Amino acid sequence: MNIELDMHTHTLASGHAYSTLQEMARAGAEKGLKLLGITEHTSGIPGTCDPIYFRNLHVVPRRMYGIDLMLGAEINILDSKGTLDADEALMKKLDIRIAGIHLLCYEHGTVEENTHGMIQAI
């Protein structure tokens, strides 16, 4: 199988990864990726990026080492209502937005409640 993209990655800016953006792009290019999505955590995860980080992404090149980059966020779903920890103004500045439930900032619910939260977030 030939994998051409990875759209859910973190750099050291997320607080729990160990590579820089340039290191990630170089490694992706070496593996033959054509597209790499960098999706740092938003503020619901302790120790991660400040909103200013996302607002400044416009200065970062969208191509490095021959690989295209999409820069964005892994936005936290905070509850079963689908509340997100990023506002619309911030989200509009991103190339890519993914969302997830993380127990560090989400009160665990039933499968039905969690599913409802995911659907509401969409």
Predicted regions mapped to residue ranges:
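Hydrophobic "anchor" residues on beta-strands that sit immediately upstream
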Residues: 2-4, 35-36, 70
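Histidine-centered catalytic micro-motifs
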Residues: 4-15, 38-41
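Divalent metal-coordination and catalytic microenvironments
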Residues: 8, 28, 40, 69, ...
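Histidine/acidic-residue-rich catalytic or RNA/ligand-binding cores of hydrolases
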Residues: 15-19, 47-51
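Glycine-rich anion/phosphate-binding loops
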Residues: 16-20, 110-113
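Alpha-helical scaffold segments that flank or form the walls of functional sites
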Residues: 22-36, 56-62
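Conserved beta-strand edge residues that scaffold enzyme active sites
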Residues: 42-43, 76
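Extended substrate/RNA-proximal surfaces in nucleic-acid metabolism proteins
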Residues: 48-122
